[in-house]
């Protein structure tokens, strides 16, 4: 029955692509995927990294309105990946979702680029000290449509592109599974390299050459990303969508609730198994029964009311297979680990706000004639991240492998844990650097001169920026690996969307934390930890150390979650040259961060 199911899936793939099915995927597809990622990230980051300047200097929007416009866009862009993941996992597949989403994004970028080139689509430039004319309704409509198309495009690209790349390695082939974790490292490396190029070269072009060229280059890069991605079509592994994963999860919950009064069977083998029904959603292996959350197992208890007949597909709202029950268990188990990464994003977010404000008050001259822009300080984070990824992949893994015996060196839970520790050190160091900066300001009588440069080198900030980059190389990639590896096979786009959603929540938590600290640290004399106008009179170091304490508490929470976490147990089917599948049980259920 199981072999027939696999043959059926192969036939579906033949019909889907219109030609005989042959081995696809693997390393040969990586140049297309990485070229797509570099061009796409160069386009997206180059398009938005300096957008606040475009809105204020070209469209003459007030700063608050411009900031709120971009914030609303960012919030929408963080929600649409759930929609894109649903479409990809349910019926469209990842390839077509990425392709059409990229085209939608391309249209939005082209629209805004045209508005930057044609003078009538922008308000007239300001002359001298006169009041600038703000963009009218028609001109703003172009902006809003472009940003909306960008948000919709992001929704299809973000959750699918990284999962699609990982799909190119066959999990049932031991020779390819070891390449999957390597893929995540190099995917993030390509992304970081593109970001580095965007925040330096493209931002400089936008500020010093012109917005037509500054937005035109990212638009062309986006077009090239689509060409590069589509160019590998015949080489890719195209996994057939298996229907809405959300519907299956809800069906398990409803079936378990309906049978909540039943007594649990003593022998798990008496539960409902059906390899033929589960074949489309378990190509990489079947999830086996676990003892945790046994109340959900009641959804797989067969009763007379189910009226189950041989060869008949059951009503899934009343009866679910064990594999589908374990899908829901996997999603629930992932929640606490996934949520633990939110505070790291909160800490990382301070680089673009308060750390940047610190940099503005410090001496940033490399030579008498060249000064590093405060907004380019993130370059040190990106360089540290890229360097760490290379070191991790080429040195760290080989050394760790000798001690752990694991092909990937350490598990993704280990990797996330290391990232948490480094992030704690980064915010701790940031607090001490602020103490040093203010001591120099006091020494030179500059406490009440917020716009005067404090005679202290910006090099003092490099450790905190660099440590955040190292932390991201460990935590963010480990986080992404965790979501992809531990998510049910048919929900990997959705799982990647959850990764982006965690990043979004981390930024929102940062906003909430800043608001609360600003409110409750205010004193009658007007002093505040986070003052509006004079950082020298604030207590920014206290804010950094507050984040340090919160991260330390979060680390304890993470270690507890990792200790009790149960890896999803998969029964993999190897069907190389042998007509009968060889089943290999992956004993992962007792592995944890602490045990390993």
UniProtKB/Swiss-Prot annotation:
SUPFAM superfamilies reported in the protein's UniProt record: MFS general substrate transporter
Species this protein is from: Arabidopsis thaliana (Mouse-ear cress)
Cell membrane is among the record's keywords: no
Signal peptide: none
Principal subcellular localization: membrane
PANTHER family: OLIGOPEPTIDE TRANSPORTER-RELATED (PTHR11654)
Disruption-associated phenotype: Slower growth and delayed bolting. Nitrite accumulation in leaves.
Transport recorded as keyword: yes
Entry-linked Pfam families: PTR2
Tissue: Expressed in shoots, stems, leaves, flowers and siliques.
Membrane topology: Multi-pass membrane protein
Residues covered by region (Disordered): 1-23
Name used for this protein in its record: Protein NRT1/ PTR FAMILY 3.1
Family designation: Belongs to the major facilitator superfamily. Proton-dependent oligopeptide transporter (POT/PTR) (TC 2.A.17) family.
Coiled coil feature spans: none
Keywords of the record: Membrane, Nitrate assimilation, Transmembrane, Transmembrane helix, Transport
GO cellular component terms listed in the entry, alphabetical order: intracellular vesicle; plasma membrane
Subcellular compartments: Membrane
Recorded name of the encoding gene: NPF3.1
Residues passing through the membrane, by range: 27-47, 73-93, 98-118, 137-157, 185-205, 213-233, 334-354, 372-392, 416-436, 453-473, 497-517, 542-562
Gene3D superfamilies attached to this UniProt entry: MFS general substrate transporter like domains (1.20.1250.20)
Any one Gene Ontology molecular-function term assigned to this protein's record: transmembrane transporter activity
């Amino acid at each position: 029955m199981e072999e027939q199911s696999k043959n059926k899936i192969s036939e579906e793939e033949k019909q889907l692509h219109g030609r005989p099915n042959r081995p696809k995927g693997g390393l040969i597809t990586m140049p297309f995927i990485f070229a797509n990622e570099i061009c796409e990230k160069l386009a997206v980051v180059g398009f938005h990294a300096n957008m606040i300047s475009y809105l204020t200097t070209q469209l003459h929007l007030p700063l608050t309105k411009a900031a709120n416009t971009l914030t609303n866009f960012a919030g929408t862009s963080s929600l649409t990946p759930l929609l894109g993941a649903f479409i990809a996992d349910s019926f469209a597949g990842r390839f077509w979702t990425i392709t059409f989403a990229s085209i939608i994004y391309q249209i939005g970028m082209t629209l805004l680029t045209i508005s930057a080139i044609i003078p009538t689509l922008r308000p007239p430039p300001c002359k001298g000290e006169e009041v600038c004319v703000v963009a009218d309704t028609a001109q703003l409509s172009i902006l809003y449509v472009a940003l909306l198309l960008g948000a919709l495009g992001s929704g299809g690209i973000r959750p699918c592109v990284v999962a699609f790349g990982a799909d190119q390695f066959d999990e049932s082939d031991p020779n390819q599974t070891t390449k999957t974790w390597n893929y995540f490292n190099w995917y993030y490396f390509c992304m970081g390299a593109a970001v580095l190029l965007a925040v330096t070269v493209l931002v400089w072009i936008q500020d010093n050459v012109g917005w037509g060229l500054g937005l035109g280059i990212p638009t062309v890069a986006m077009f090239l990303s689509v060409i590069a991605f589509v160019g590998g079509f015949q080489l890719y592994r195209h996994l057939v969508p298996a229907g809405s994963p959300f519907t299956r999860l809800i069906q398990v919950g409803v079936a378990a609730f309906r049978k909540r009064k039943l007594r649990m069977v003593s022998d798990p083998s008496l539960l409902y198994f059906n390899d033929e029904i589960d074949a489309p959603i378990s190509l990489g292996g079947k999830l086996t029964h676990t003892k945790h959350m046994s109340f959900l197992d009641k959804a797989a208890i067969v009763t007379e009311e189910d009226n189950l007949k041989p060869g008949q597909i059951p009503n899934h709202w009343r009866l679910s297979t064990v594999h589908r029950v374990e899908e829901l268990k996997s999603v629930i188990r992932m929640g606490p680990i996934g949520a633990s990464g939110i505070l790291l994003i909160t800490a990382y977010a301070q680089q673009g706000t308060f750390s940047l404000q610190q940099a503005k008050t410090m001496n940033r001259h490399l030579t008498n004639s060249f000064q590093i822009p405060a907004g380019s300080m993130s370059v040190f984070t990106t360089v540290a991240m890229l360097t760490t990824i290379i070191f991790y992949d080429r040195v760290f893994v080989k050394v760790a492998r000798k001690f752990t015996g694991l092909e990937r060196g350490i598990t993704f839970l280990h990797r996330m844990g290391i990232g948490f520790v480094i992030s704690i050190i980064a915010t701790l160091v940031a607090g001490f650097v602020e103490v040093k900066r203010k001591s120099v300001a006091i020494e030179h009588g500059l406490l009440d001169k917020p716009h005067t440069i404090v005679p202290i080198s910006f090099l003092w900030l490099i450790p905190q920026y660099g440590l955040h980059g190292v932390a991201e190389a460990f935590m963010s990639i480990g986080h992404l690996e965790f979501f992809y590896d531990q998510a049910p096979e048919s929900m990997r786009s959705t799982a990647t969307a959850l990764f982006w959603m965690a990043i979004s929540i981390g930024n929102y938590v940062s906003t909430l934390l800043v608001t609360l600290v600003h409110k409750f640290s205010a004193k009658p004399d007007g002093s505040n930890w986070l003052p509006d106008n004079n950082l020298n009179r604030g207590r920014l170091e206290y804010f950094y150390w507050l984040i340090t304490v919160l991260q330390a508490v979060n680390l304890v929470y993470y270690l507890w979650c990792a200790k009790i976490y149960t890896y999803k147990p998969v029964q993999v089917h190897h069907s190389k040259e042998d007509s009968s599948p060889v089943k290999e049980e992956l004993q992962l259920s007792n592995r944890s961060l602490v045990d390993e």
